[in-house]
């Protein structure tokens, strides 16, 4: 077992015995601190600034050492606002990296980057803590079995299946439905797999964090009456936090997930919304630390920072962490260094398309751009692979024909192409699905569709058995039987109108 959580007991020294330094310089969220000769803190040590500001308000700021500058000075990044700090203030070296509470006590609670509860539900049992910086598991501890992680979402399970213990990227610009998809996945996984989730809200909107919390309480993922029965722990470092907090909140969430995997030997889901904000926070801090910017103004250490986070997210012989990461794509440009670096670590990508969202097809997952290393006949089986390939071919042909249709109209197409277009439009609509978490907006009850049902449905559309049904019947339904029932209802309605 890799993890060695520290158990704080009577033997742990108090802050009073620690080395004291003084603030020498403050540049926004970055502090330079002078220490006595020979008493320098280590890289990643947590420093605490306590005192009162000019108005007499209590100050308690935790920082993390990033650089040793020479001349007995260190440069540290603050994890909370530096308002009210002045030069000459006392700084305490805690002698250890940031450590956060782990284990069952974290379920149903909301934490900040320091592992402090921020949900006004009282203190958390902090007897078991783990440092947020740790090396990735050794090769010999990794589990190499390949298996599919069923999500109950048709377009995902069929065309870009997720790997159990893999890393999945949700790509998309602003407002195409990433967060709703993440909420649906948390909901489905808690209900269908009974798994524990850790949600890391990295640099996103506070309102969304609050909505997600309320949604989880309503759906029973968080059990207010008995928090121990909750299925998720939440860690937030939102947009209003300084870059230091946004840069480290992902590691706090990951540390909590690692404990469930290594000590409790569970399968864990780690959601990160949004991994781009992790990179962005690193880039904000990087220039203040005096590093030369790299491509497009990003930090030169971009690949290293990303690697140190991603390599810890993996399956071991004890358990697995399956990670689903929302990736904001700046200006919808997939070649931007932030999404491009993220791509290198992923087993599957779910790309959300603005075009599909504009058509009202939700989830707006692009069937041609989304990929998965799991979509191979030896892993998913011949039937699944064949069906997925035929769905992609039909969608691709429809895409190629769209220019001709726009200029000349459908009548100019050959009989075969017209049939392809009709089936592709049915497929496009059948890839949409009502979500449990969107019931409030849509009014239609959510649907969980098993993989076997999904394959059966698409095989029927491709075989031509359902060519006579109107394409509207396939829109926002669960399995194929619902589509045929909807077609009958539509027919009855149209007759009654006449």
UniProtKB/Swiss-Prot annotation:
The keyword Ion transport applies. Its main location: plastid. CDD domains: ATP-synt_F1_beta_C, ATP-synt_F1_beta_N, F1-ATPase_beta_CD. Keywords: ATP synthesis, ATP-binding, CF(1), Chloroplast, Hydrogen ion transport, Ion transport, Membrane, Nucleotide-binding, Plastid, Thylakoid, Translocase, Transport. It holds the Pfam family ATP-synt_VA_C. The keyword Membrane applies. It comes from the Eukaryota. ATP binds at residues 172-179. Its EC number is 7.1.2.2. GO terms for biological process: proton motive force-driven mitochondrial ATP synthesis. InterPro entries: AAA+_ATPase, ATP-synt_VA_C, ATP_synth_F1_bsu, ATPase_a/bsu_AS, ATPase_alpha/beta_chains, ATPase_F1/V1/A1_a/bsu_N, ATPase_F1/V1/A1_a/bsu_N_sf, ATPase_F1/V1/A1_a/bsu_nucl-bd. Produces ATP from ADP in the presence of a proton gradient across the membrane. The catalytic sites are hosted primarily by the beta subunits. This is ATP synthase subunit beta, chloroplastic.
């Amino acid at each position: 077992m890799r993890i060695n959580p520290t158990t704080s007991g009577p033997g742990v020294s108090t802050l009073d015995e620690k080395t004291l330094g003084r603030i020498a310089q403050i540049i926004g969220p970055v502090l330079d601190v002078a220490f006595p000769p020979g008493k320098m803190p280590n890289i990643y040590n947590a420093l605490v600034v306590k005192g009162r500001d000019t108005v007499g308000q209590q100050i308690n700021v935790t920082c993390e050492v990033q650089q040793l500058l020479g001349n007995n000075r260190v440069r540290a990044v603050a994890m909370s606002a530096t308002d009210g700090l002045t030069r000459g203030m006392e700084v305490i070296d805690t002698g250890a990296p940031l450590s956060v509470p782990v284990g069952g006590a974290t379920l149903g609670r909301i934490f900040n980057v320091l592992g402090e509860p921020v949900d006004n539900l009282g203190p958390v049992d902090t007897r078991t803590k783990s440092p947020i910086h740790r090396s990735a598991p050794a090769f010999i501890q990794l589990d190499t079995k390949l298996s599919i992680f069923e999500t109950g979402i048709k377009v995902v399970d069929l065309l870009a299946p997720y790997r159990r213990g893999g890393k999945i990227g949700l790509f998309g610009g602003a407002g195409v439905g990433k967060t709703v998809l993440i909420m649906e996945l948390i909901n489905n996984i808690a209900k269908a797999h009974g798994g524990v989730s850790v949600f890391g809200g990295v640099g996103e909107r506070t309102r969304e964090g609050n909505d997600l919390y309320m949604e989880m309480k309503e759906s029973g993922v968080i059990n207010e009456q008995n928090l121990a029965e909750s299925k998720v722990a939440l860690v937030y470092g939102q947009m209003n936090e300084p870059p230091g907090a946004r840069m480290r909140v992902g590691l706090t969430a990951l540390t909590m997930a690692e404990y469930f995997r290594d000590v409790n030997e569970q399968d864990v889901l780690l959601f990160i919304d949004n991994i781009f904000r992790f990179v962005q926070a690193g880039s904000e801090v990087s220039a203040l630390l005096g590093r030369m910017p790299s491509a497009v103004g990003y930090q030169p250490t971009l690949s290293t920072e990303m690697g140190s986070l991603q390599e810890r997210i993996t399956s071991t012989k004890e358990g697995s962490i399956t990670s689903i990461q929302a990736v904001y794509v700046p200006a919808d440009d997939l070649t931007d260094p932030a999404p491009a670096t993220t791509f290198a670590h992923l087993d599957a990508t779910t790309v959300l398309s603005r075009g599909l969202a504009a058509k009202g097809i939700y989830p707006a997952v692009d069937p041609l751009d989304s990929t998965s290393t799991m979509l191979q006949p030896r892993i998913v089986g011949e039937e699944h692979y064949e069906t997925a390939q035929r769905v992609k071919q039909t969608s691709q042909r429809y895409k190629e024909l769209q220019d001709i249709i726009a200029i000349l109209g459908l009548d100019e197409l050959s009989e075969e192409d017209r049939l392809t277009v009709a089936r592709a439009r049915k497929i496009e609509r059948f890839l949409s699905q009502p979500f449990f978490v969107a019931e409030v907006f849509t009014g239609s009850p959510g649907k969980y569709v098993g993989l076997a049902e999904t394959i059966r449905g698409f095989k029927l559309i491709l075989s031509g058995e359902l060519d006579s049904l109107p394409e509207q019947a396939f829109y926002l339904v669960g399995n194929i039987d619902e589509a045929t029932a909807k077609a009958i209802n539509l027919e009855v309605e149209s007759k009654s109108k006449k």
